[in-house]
Amino acid sequence: MRMYPMKSPFLISNLYFGKGDPMPNRFKKSMKHLAAAVCLTLSCVMPCAAQEFLPVSEVQEGMHGYAKTVVHGTKIETFDVDVLGIMKGKGATGGDLVLVKVSGPLIDQTEGIAQGMSGSPVYIDGKLLGAVAYGFPQSGGRIGMVTPIGDMLKLWTIDDGKDTGLTPPSSKGLIPLTTPLMASGYTPEAMDFLAGKMQDFHMVPFASASASQDDVPQPLEPGSAVSATMVTGDLKLGAVGTVTYVDGDRMVAFGHPFMDRGNTDYFMHNSYIFTVIPSKNIPFKLGSVGAEIGTVNQDRGAGIGGMMGKLPHAVSLHASVTDEDTKKKEDLHVRMIPNEALLPTLSVTSVYHAISNAMDRKGQGTVDFTYTLYPEDMKQKPFTRSNMYWSSKDIAERSVDELYNVVRLLEQNRFEKYPLRSIMVDMHVTSERKTAQLLDASASPIIVSPGDTIYVRARLSPYRGEVFYKDLTFTVPKDQPYGDMILEVRGGGVVPLPYLIQQQKFNLTDEILDRIRTYKDFNDLHSRLMKEDQNNQVVVEILDPEVSMISKGENDGKKAEIQEKKAPENPDYLKNKDGLKEDGEKETHKSAVDTDYVIYGDGQFTFKVLPQAERDKALKKLAKSKQQATIEMSNKEKETLENKDKKTEGTDKDEKDSQKTSAMIAL
């Protein structure tokens, strides 16, 4: 028979503070809540008699008691508990669990033990035994297991100074594969996106709501509903369970781990329970995340522990999104827990909600955005990037991919910690397709020496727009070897076709390329991520000759042959641009110019790199041969025209236009 903990349902609610309400006001409101929580805690501590505990060694089969929990609003109610026996060594910390049977009108109403009841204190003869924490769905929800209070109180004395990130589910079969999430305030599109992202953490979101009294802090007592929250502010995301024991400003709850992170910085919130939702597997409480009242600083096998009146460390996020079509603007302010594993997901799901709410639609669009990550350590450099994306399917999802990847790479890098203080995002979105195809490009000179400047002109065609040109220069590296040098001209988000062919040839997936990529240190990682090409740039860079598609004699170096192809719909924008070699082996030499469009297409030039003396000699010879070719062509044209019959005016015009076109293509 499989045991399931009474996992605490996640709740998400959207608190409205008024249009344009700044973050400092929210912060002040949180501080007021915390101050009120301290006063409420102190006011109820004085008259309370010391609670007696019942050790497991004194527990006997057949003992009868009761448990406390909330199934509606904030009213604490009770249900009956009968001891069935002791299960040795079955606890998450290696301790014992007490097997119990629950009953009574409340249990009949909820159809058994429900998720969210985790932490419900169990009393026998007035003594606190522990917290209802696990259940057997196969028993109709009437059989559960209690975590002893002695194991839970140890949470107050543990401090290893470590945040362990996310711990995999216990091998003892006590933690289910999924945890229900409750959400309110999210657009339907944002809910779908949230569901996909939370699958990585074995959690499934459901719709919830907010309560009118959520802003009013309430004192905690055994049996109260409490939330361990990961996101607070305009949006709230948290796990709701039950308080087991309170001593002054300290409390323990849940009776099982939330995410088993060890030392934590969750926000502690009150919770209002709307109802208990029936389920085929196990029912769960549906509630809101209320006023912020403290910090949850421990998350371990025996439960969670925290302090009221203490503000946790957090990462703030401000997202400003403007829909250029409707001029609607969405401003979002949230605070998030500083967990390396969760922060990428918490960040992008919040930003996705902001862009989805601003657009009020789903589908194609172009987004232009800038974001900055500010580190907690002011001595470390902030990370700032701008980029542009187009999607024909879901521009909201497309626009947050880069932010997710960058936050993940920086937060989970192998060199050093990079804790963030805040994230700022500014987005402008439109339904207009702002893309351009790179038609061709010309370059001069085609014979160069190390250190020379090459002038490149790219011709681009916007989607349903007029052709335009972009000029840029490229400096030949001073250490460039003599011989052929191949330059790639491409859109900033396009992976050169030769590299894609090599990737397929050796069956190199994006995951493998990411593994073989190396960085010298954190500064190298930080710098190179910031300098990654932008999708709205025309980029010129040296292409590895080992993977070039240009064969000798196929290209005269005067014009790039452009491949008319788009980048993959969901490319990893951090692909290795240096071919199959490790990134750290050589510096990438490139030049780029910004445009107002997402650029597609790429092609290559071949240049001859020679010593200066040989270069000058070759250029003179080339100029002379071009001059001779021009003279010969002029004489031939003159002779042809003299021998021709007189043509009509229209025919003459067509021939002249044809000559002009040929001359232009030959340039």
Predicted regions and their residues:
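Bacterial N-terminal signal peptides
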Residues: 35-45
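Intrinsic disorder/low-complexity segments
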Residues: 10-12
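Terminal presequence/propeptide segments associated with secretion/organelle targeting
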Residues: 49-667
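Short, intrinsically disordered, low-complexity terminal segments
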Residues: 32-34, 47, 648
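Extreme N-termini of proteins with methionine-enriched Sec-type signal peptides or N-terminal signal-anchor
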Residues: 6, 20-23, 654
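Short, Lys/Arg-enriched N-terminal segments with co-localized hydrophobic residues
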Residues: 2, 14-22
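Bacterial N-terminal signal peptides that target proteins for export
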Residues: 21-35
